[in-house]
A protein has these predicted regions:
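Short beta-strand/loop motif that positions the catalytic acidic residue
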Residues: 279-281
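Short glycine-enriched nucleophile-adjacent loop
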Residues: 149-160, 498
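Accessory cap/linker subdomain of secreted extracellular hydrolases
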Residues: 93, 157-271, 354
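Alpha/beta-hydrolase fold nucleophile elbow
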Residues: 134-147
Length: 629
């Protein structure tokens, strides 16, 4: 089979390890010593006979495969295996075989695509096939981001015998616990992913005429988005039935139950193979909550070392700036040498100096945002800054959950409300939802802006193009502290306990945490920096596994989980919490009608009331670090 594959020899010598703006020490790895032989489109059989297209990059000496056996770094991707050439250029000269495989039904692979449900079995089959090849020394690691990070965890959940370590970056996992379904709401970036990727890499898109139709659908995604719900057989997506079927099933299924179990790592961490795991994430990544909670779950479930690095990053990017904000030079990290050091330790057995250098001298390394002075950078961004903190664990044991209470008139303070009765009422019109402006979203810039953003409308949001603050909307209820008297560092998970009622049998409540900069010469209107947000659909207020409609007018508690935060709120800044009932298109809009999820025909304006009195003390719980820690 290998002999039949197309052979190519390329020289990738002279690569140098880049010093990192990440700590005080560069990380060592093997020096480049090999050229590369490429074997394209090797068709690797799975246990059911389906063959998956696989590119193999082998260490070479001259025009021949180098003698001996080598550890393997494997990528399994739905995005096209050609994208792994950069990793091959880096790792193969250093004595690794790099393998890139199109997942089932994607790229050049045979079979029918399903959203990750085949990847436990296929990952195990691919790994065991590789382990039996004469150039493999029996040790395999994996790498990749997002969906490609998920295929690593799924292979580990399948307990592939020769899988030695994984390095998932921003892994797309825990779909019933925030990855796709967030508090009962649907993350529309998945809808966008399907609409976009069915036109790129699906089996159907190999037909040029069909590809054109699917691309036209993607080009008009905003119009389709404004006319949800998507109905079976009534859009061009019907020409790719496996994509249409999977998307509709996901959008209809909001309960965190057996349907989502296939990639639920948090609640089934005991199924994960006990191997070294190195997790890489970002505070503005859409999977920030999932990544940090997966770290905590694996630390309890397995004995192998588990390490976590969290930067100020968006999905798949480890740069110093994104959105409207610059985090400073230390935020920019070259991940490849860091991964290389990990592979040297766990695939090659080198232990010299490992654990004495960043980021592996402690289990957790995280970037604390917010040490900057807020000036405007030459490219027009706010300089928020930040610095790296090493920690023995996450969440930080020294972080103290501290309640800040919502008060009448928009105040936010640690004092419990004194009023016997106090509330704020607003109307939520699902035809005019609050727009998404940044935050933990990704991969959908055609419909929403991602990352660290000032909470104003503008051209970056097609549903709110006017350059005015979101706080000017009548359906955004704002609660703000006085200017802080000292720096306040918040690190860890965040939640809002809201007491509320509605005129509808079902509605949403959203919460958003904001670092409010005071007006300055560079930013005369100030700057409202989103730190994270969350949502809870009313029918899932008691359980994420079952629905229970609301009784109109009855007061209920709603516990909203927000994205985690790692930020220093500086002296003179304010901590702000925005409460509303929509965040579109990060989440699908609740029609308030109580109809089945993603099968509604009516939209009803809901009258929603938030309570903030002595008996119904709505609050945000912030993990505060003691001063000087």
């Amino acid at each position: 089979m290998l002999a039949a594959a197309r052979l190519r020899v390329t020289a990738f010598c002279g690569l140098a390890i880049v010093a990192l703006a990440y700590g005080t020490t560069a990380i060592s790895a093997s020096e480049p010593a090999y050229q590369v032989i490429t074997r394209k489109n090797v068709m690797v059989p799975m246990r059911d006979g389906v063959r998956l297209a696989t590119d193999i990059y082998l260490p070479a000496q001259g025009s021949d495969v180098a003698p001996g056996r080598f550890p393997v770094v494997l990528t399994r991707t739905p995005y096209g295996k050609d994208g792994s050439l950069g990793d091959a250029k880096y790792y193969v000269p250093r004595g690794y075989v790099v393998i890139a495989q199109d997942t089932r039904g994607r790229g050049r692979s045979d079979g029918t695509w399903h959203w990750m449900t085949d990847d436990r079995q296929d990952g195990c089959d691919a790994i065991e096939w590789i382990a039996g090849q004469p150039w493999c020394d029996g040790k395999l690691g994996m790498l990749g981001c997002s969906y490609v990070g998920a295929t690593q965890h799924l292979a580990a959940m399948g307990r592939a015998p020769h899988l030695v370590t994984i390095v998932p970056a921003d892994p797309s996992i825990n779909h019933g616990l925030g990855g796709i379904i967030y508090g009962g709401a649907f993350r529309l970036r998945v809808w966008n992913w399907v609409i976009n990727n069915v036109a790129k890499g699906s089996a159907e898109s190999r037909d040029p005429a069909v590809k054109e139709v699917l691309q036209q659908q993607a080009d008009n995604r905003r119009h389709y988005l404004m006319n949800l719900p998507l109905r079976r057989g009534l859009t061009p997506l019907r020409v790719a039935p496996e994509y249409e079927d999977m998307l509709l099933k996901m959008m209809e299924h909001r309960r965190n139950d057996e349907f989502w179990r296939f990639n639920n790592i948090i609640q089934y961490a005991d199924e994960h193979k006990d191997i070294p795991v190195f997790l890489i994430g970002g505070w503005y990544d859409l999977f920030s909550r999932s990544t940090t909670e997966t770290y905590a779950a694996l630390k309890k479930a397995i004995h192998g070392p588990v390490h976590l690095v969290m930067g100020p990053w968006i999905h798949g990017m480890q740069g110093r700036s994104h959105g409207d904000v610059d985090f400073g030079p230390e935020a920019a990290v070259d991940i490849r040498p860091i991964r290389a050091a990990w592979y040297e330790r766990w695939l090659k057995g080198r232990s010299d100096g490992f654990g004495t250098e960043v980021p592996f001298r402690t289990p957790v390394r995280m970037f604390v945002m917010g040490s900057g002075d807020g000036h405007k950078t030459p490219d027009g961004k706010l300089y928020h800054g930040g610095y790296w903190r090493d920690a023995a664990d996450y969440p930080l044991p020294e972080a103290r959950p501290t309640k800040y209470y919502l008060h009448a008139g928009g105040a936010l303070s640690p004092s419990v409300p004194a009023e016997k009765q106090s509330s704020t009422t607003f109307e939520f019109d699902p035809k005019n939802p609050v727009p998404t402006v940044g935050g933990c979203v990704c991969c959908a810039r055609q419909i929403m802006a991602d990352g660290a953003r000032n909470q104003w409308g503008g051209e970056h949001t097609f549903t709110w193009p006017a350059p005015i603050p979101l706080s000017a909307r009548n359906d955004v209820i704002v609660f703000t502290t006085p200017p802080l008297e000292h720096d306040t560092e918040i690190v860890g998970p965040i939640s809002v306990q809201l007491w509320a009622c509605s005129s509808a049998v079902d509605t949403d409540f959203t919460a958003k945490l904001i670092d409010v900069y005071p007006p300055s010469k560079d930013f005369p209107a100030g700057f409202d920096l989103i730190m994270g947000d969350g949502v809870l659909r009313g029918r899932y207020r008691e359980s994420d596994k079952s629905e229970k409609m609301m009784t109109p007018g009855q007061v209920y508690p709603f516990r909203i989980t927000l994205d985690p935060c790692c930020n220093r709120f500086k002296k003179g800044h304010r901590i702000r919490v925005d409460i509303s009932s929509s965040n579109f298109p990060r989440f699908d809009v609740n029609p308030n009608s109580g109809e089945p999820m993603h099968d509604y025909r009516r939209m009803i304006t809901a009258v929603n009331t938030i309570y903030h009195d002595r008996e119904h003390a709505s609050q945000i719980v912030l993990p505060l670090l003691p001063a000087g820690r």
